[in-house]
């Protein structure tokens, strides 16, 4: 299932939903780290900006998983950060979710 298709099916988020989303976002974050660390990376600054933007969402999900809950406000903020990342940098819509 595609990343945003999965997110759009969630009415009331659970910690299990957050774990699934976290796994996909974390894979994207790891890919960005690899690209930034490539020798003679011409796009180093771009990859670092990508990582900083995505890190906000990742940190929110970690906090929710640690607290074993997500409030409606946290969910809306998380969705805002994820969609903002997609608009600014792209690449998330091609992620697949493993259930």
List PLM regions with ranges.
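N-terminal acidic leader/helix
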Residues: 3-30
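Acidic, low-complexity, intrinsically disordered interaction modules
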Residues: 27-93, 97
């Amino acid at each position: 299932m595609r990343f945003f298709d999965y997110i759009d099916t969630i009415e009331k988020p659970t910690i299990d939903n957050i774990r699934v989303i976290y796994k996909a976002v974390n894979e994207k974050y790891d890919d960005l780290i690899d690209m930034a660390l490539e020798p003679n990376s011409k796009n180093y600054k771009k990859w670092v900006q990508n990582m900083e933007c995505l890190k906000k969402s990742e940190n929110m999900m970690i906090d929710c998983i640690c607290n074993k809950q997500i409030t409606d406000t946290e969910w809306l903020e998380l969705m805002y950060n994820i969609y903002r990342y997609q608009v600014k940098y792209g690449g998330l819509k091609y992620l697949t979710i493993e259930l």
